[in-house]
Design a protein with these regions (language model features):
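A short beta-loop-alpha structural element at the N-terminal edge
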Residues: 30-44
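Conserved GNAT-fold acetyl-CoA-binding loop/helix
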Residues: 47-69
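A short helix-loop-beta-strand connector motif used in the catalytic cores of GNAT acetyltransferases and
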Residues: 70-82
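Conserved beta-strand in the GNAT
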Residues: 82, 88-97, 113, 118
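Conserved catalytic-core motifs of GNAT/GCN5-like acyltransferases
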Residues: 97-102, 149-151, 155-157, 161, ...
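Conserved acetyl-CoA binding element of GNAT-fold acetyltransferases
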Residues: 105-121, 170-173
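Conserved acetyl-CoA pyrophosphate-binding loop and the N-cap/start of the following alpha-helix
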Residues: 123, 127-135
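Conserved GNAT acetyl-CoA-binding A-motif
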Residues: 140-152
Length: 176
């Protein structure tokens, strides 16, 4: 699997906090923000996403994910929009907010880190990921972020480039 790092400058049209219902092909879908009552299912889907991307499971990630999401949802530094068909979560998104020292292309120092973009295989190619992406990017804009960053999976590259993300050739990472 090839992982590509991309970055976007925020300019996409706004999304709203209003729940939107869409019906097509027997599917009645809603877009809603993640709340604590849906967190266990969200975490299950996050782990499915990581498996699908080829991650090696050598630890139980559930406790760490639950701790992370609880802390960062509470302090406002993580937000997620979900696509829901009835009671079933069929698509997820996530945006974490970090702050770094300001620099010329990002004077606020605030950056969005996009994660948890996942759509149930039975619901792919219906525009769900694009709608979720537009909502979390708007959350980043509203937070004051100057950019959004992501490490894109093979499957996500087309979605992100069509949306306006561009590769950032200077990105490097040091792993412990």
């Amino acid at each position: 699997m090839i992982i590509v790092n991309v970055i976007i400058t925020l300019f996409y049209p706004p999304a709203t906090d209003i729940i939107i219902e869409i019906s097509f092909g027997g599917i009645k879908m809603e877009y809603v923000k993640l709340t604590e009552d849906k967190l266990d299912e969200f975490i299950r889907l996050r782990i499915n996403q990581l498996r699908e991307e080829g991650a090696t499971e050598d630890i139980d990630l559930v406790p760490a994910l639950k701790d992370y999401y609880n802390r960062h949802m509470a302090d406002g530094t993580f937000v997620s929009w979900l696509a829901v068909d009835g009671e079933k979560i069929i698509g997820t998104s996530g945006m974490s907010f970090v702050e770094r020292p300001p620099y010329f292309s990002c004077p606020s120092g605030k950056t969005g880190i996009l994660s948890s973009m996942y759509t149930d295989p039975d619901y792919r190619r219906m525009g769900i990921a694009k709608e979720l992406l537009s909502r979390v990017v708007e959350e980043a804009r509203n937070y004051g972020c100057g950019s959004v960053q992501i490490t894109a999976s093979d499957m996500g590259v087309l979605l992100y480039t069509d949306f306006g993300f561009v590769k950032n050739g200077n990105f490097m990472q040091y792993k412990f």
